[in-house]
Swiss-Prot record:
Binding site for S-adenosyl-L-methionine: 98-99, 114-115, 150-151, 168
Keyword Cytoplasm tagged: yes
CDD domains (UniProt xref): AdoMet_MTases
Location(s) in or outside the cell: Cytoplasm
Lineage of producing organism: Bacteria, Pseudomonadati, Pseudomonadota, Gammaproteobacteria, Alteromonadales
Name listed for the protein in its UniProt record: Ribosomal RNA small subunit methyltransferase J
SUPFAM superfamilies found in the cross-reference section: S-adenosyl-L-methionine-dependent methyltransferases
Organism: Shewanella baltica (strain OS185)
Length: 248
């Protein structure tokens, strides 16, 4: 059970917290609010920080969907997206769902796995609003879902073939941009660094039939010390690709 502060007079919040096994704690560091049909997370000792929400409909993710470079993006190349090939992807470290959304918007079917229940609650709320949206709702319902389990091992019990497992473990950020500082400060204090990130690679390789893609900061070592088959570099990050079989 995860402690959280919330207004116990709001049935919606009570239901969300019960669903994700979040227990009321008057002294909790974090608060969940439900305002304007949106679930948001707030750090109570930093009231000036905006709440964190998952929003697939407006803002930065919507802009990236429209103007982000389509299949020419490095992430699309990394997962093997090409003409006639629409891989099924498991995002094993979903976070706020941004990379998963990019892949879904390009045609992949994406299953998100998020082990922290507060983050999972935010993701589910973001999906709920996206599913209702007139512009993106139809394909979002078809291509993007949240798995109600906390591990890749749990997902492997489902009898469905997964082409690609995508991992973006939490790594200490050097980036000093305001957004990264704000979101990462809140996020890392909530979920902590992925100290067991190296343990994600083996189950990912067991689950994926075609490849595993690991997003890393450019200064980070290889996950679990395993050298990838190929690397796709961007300005600040890289995608390490572990190939098991050809995409077709």
């Amino acid at each position: 059970m995860t402690p959280i502060f919330f207004n116990q007079q709001y049935p919606t919040l009570v239901d969300i917290c019960a669903r994700w096994q979040l227990v009321y704690d008057a002294n909790a560091t974090f608060e969940l609010r439900f305002e304007s049909d949106t679930l948001s997370l707030h750090k109570r000792d930093e009231p000036k920080l905006d709440g964190i929400v998952v929003d697939f409909v407006t803002g930065a993710v919507a802009h990236r969907r429209k103007f982000g470079g389509g299949r020419g993006q490095s992430i699309a190349k990394a997962v093997g997206l090409k003409q006639g090939v629409m891989p099924s992807v498991v995002d094993g470290t979903a976070g706020l769902g941004r990379d998963a959304f990019v892949l879904a918007s390009l045609g992949c079917t994406v299953t998100m796995v998020e082990r922290h229940p507060v983050v999972a609650a935010l993701l589910e709320d973001g999906l709920r609003r996206a599913y209702q949206d007139a512009e993106i709702g139809d394909w979002m319902r078809e291509r993007m879902r949240l798995f109600h389990g906390s591990s890749l091992e749990a997902l492997s019990k489902l009898a469905q073939e997964i082409d690609v497992v995508y991992l973006d473990p939490m790594y200490p950020h050097r980036d000093k941009s305001a957004l990264v500082k704000k979101e990462m400060r809140v996020f890392q204090s909530l979920v902590g660094a992925d100290l067991d990130a190296d343990g994600l690679l083996a189950p990912a390789l067991a689950l994926a039939t075609k490849r595993v893609v690991v997003k890393r900061p450019d200064y980070a070592e290889d996950l679990d010390g395993v050298k990838p088959n190929t690397v796709i570099e961007t300005k600040k990050n890289r995608f390490d690709v572990y190939v098991k079989a050809a995409m077709k």
